[in-house]
């Protein structure tokens, strides 16, 4: 099965993608891991991407798309894959369609106010690196595991989360329109768009995804 997972920051997309890929026995391919692997292995696209990154520039779509195509051509993708973090735009979705046909796109939907609560309430222990939510802590400044001091990452501050969600919606709403067939530019293949309520317990989200893919 060939899948794409969509979901805003804080929706638990990475966790669900890892679980579903293990269940289906297909590789979980995240954009970040793919970049790191291609650069480490010094593949042609990895070296090209590294030049842009080292120069402090955004990696162009053409390089990202070539890297995805390179990765999907590997033997472990013969029976399917799960893409996490690609495509991010309609242009990337159209490019993906030119070399691989998807079976389904899973969109994990969570209201913005719940995402704000999840992310801004997250704390990290400076000592053991454990991650906790303040709702589960007796003292939000103290790690319940090792007693170390906890802190809020810059990425989890309200102004940062607001900007990340805005960027996600601007990029993703046209993409959802594309896969649903309702957008100005739309997908014409057999791929189905599945919207999952991500505002549930993680195990219930997982069950909902598997049921929808049957």
Where in this protein do the model-derived segments appear?
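Glycine-rich phosphate-binding loop of ATP-dependent small-molecule kinases
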Residues: 1-214
